[in-house]
Each structure stands twice: as structure tokens, then as C-alpha cells.
């Protein structure tokens, strides 16, 4: 995207985690109505490209289009819509924006052909334990579509996602609380600060 090769994508909106990550990009999606102030905070913290969630599930219609425009104006590298987003909204986004429209795919029953026809430029595959299987099915029929996908919780699941054909893997970092727990446990034992 814009001459950048993106292989690792951090799934977080926590600015302290984002600032201390070496991922190639950030995907800023969250389970609430998207807000430009959150996008702004993430964009200011990140020194890498940011893909911004603009709704499609809880948030619908004209608001999604407005959030997409706003994200583009703020400098997002792409906008992400959730699986329930109608193809008509994907089409409107594609016509209105100059940045990639990334559509989340959660099941093999999703209308992949319709998504592409509407203007999806990248798929964000998030099918839990079936992610590698779904990637393979998409890749077989559409070998050239860029795919970012959830890597899962282990090195093995990440490797399976890559082997299935994902171009980039999203990774969920530990929370601040989890990191602090490890640090404080080490301090209580008078051990060195753990590395991350």
C-alpha cells in the first residue's frame, strides 16, 4: 500500500502498546461506535500506517461513509468495515475514497464475489480457528486479492495462517495489565525487568 510492504499488523487501540510495537501497521477496530477522536489518538501515536475501523455492524449507512471520509482526511492508510456491511455501502465507500476499502470476512458463506464487485480491495479474514481454511478457499478462487488475517494465539496458528496464503497477519498484543503483571511479578522476586 503506497509503496509499503506490510506483513505484520498490530490489533490495538492502546496508544502505549502502539508506541512500543515493531509491527508494520496498526488495525484500529473496536466493538463500539467508531469515533474520529479515537482515530486521531491512534494516528498520532502510530509511526506506521493505520487501518481504521469505520463500522458496518453496529454503525451503519451514511455514518459509515462519513467516518470513512474523516479517516481518510486524518491520514488513514485504509478503512475497515465489518462483516454485516452491505455491498451497497462497500460500493459507496469505494466511489468516495482514495484509500483501500478493507472488508472483514468471517465465513465461507460470505459473498466474496459480491464484495469484490462492490469494490473491496483487501480482505480482513477473521474466522477464528477456521481462518486458515477460509483463506485457502478465497486464495484458490481469487489468487491476487490481498488478504490480512488473524493469526491466532500461538506461533503454530500464525504459521498456519501464513501457509494458507495470508499476505499479512494481525496480532493481538498483551494488554497493559498483562505486561505489568509480568513486570511486577519479576520485581517482587527481585528479578530483572522482563523483555517484550
Label each PLM-derived region with a short phrase.
Residues 1-2, 25-28, 48-54, 79-81, ...:
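Hydrophobic faces of well-ordered beta-strands that scaffold small-molecule active sites
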Residues 1-50, 56-61, 73:
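Conserved N-terminal beta1-alpha1 strand-loop-helix module at the mouth
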Residues 8, 52-63, 82-84, 103-109, ...:
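Glycine-rich beta-to-alpha transition loops that act as phosphate-gripper elements at the mouths
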Residues 62-71, 110-118, 153-171:
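Catalytic cores of alpha/beta
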Residues 86-122, 126-130:
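Histidine/lysine/aspartate-rich catalytic loop segments that bind and position anionic ligands
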Amino acid at each position: 500500500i503506497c509503496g509499503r510492504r506490510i506483513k505484520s499488523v498490530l490489533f490495538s487501540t492502546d496508544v502505549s502498546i502502539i508506541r512500543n510495537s515493531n509491527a508494520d501497521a496498526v488495525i484500529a477496530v473496536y466493538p463500539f461506535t467508531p469515533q474520529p477522536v479515537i482515530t486521531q489518538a491512534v494516528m498520532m501515536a502510530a509511526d506506521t500506517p493505520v487501518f481504521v475501523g469505520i463500522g458496518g455492524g453496529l454503525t451503519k449507512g451514511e455514518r459509515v461513509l462519513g467516518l470513512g471520509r474523516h479517516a481518510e482526511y486524518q491520514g488513514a492508510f485504509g478503512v475497515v468495515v465489518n462483516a454485516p456491511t452491505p455491498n451497497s455501502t462497500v460500493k459507496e465507500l469505494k466511489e468516495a475514497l482514495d484509500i483501500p476499502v478493507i472488508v472483514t470476512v468471517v465465513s465461507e458463506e460470505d459473498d466474496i464475489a459480491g464484495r469484490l464487485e462492490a469494490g473491496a480491495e483487501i480482505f480482513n479474514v477473521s474466522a477464528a480457528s477456521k481462518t486458515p481454511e477460509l483463506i485457502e478457499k478465497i486464495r484458490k478462487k481469487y489468487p491476487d486479492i490481498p488478504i490480512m488475517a488473524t493469526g491466532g494465539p500461538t506461533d503454530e496458528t500464525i504459521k498456519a495462517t501464513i501457509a494458507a496464503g495470508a499476505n499479512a497477519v494481525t496480532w493481538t498484543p498483551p494488554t497493559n495489565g498483562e505486561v505489568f503483571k509480568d513486570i511486577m511479578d519479576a520485581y517482587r522476586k527481585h528479578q530483572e525487568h522482563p523483555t517484550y
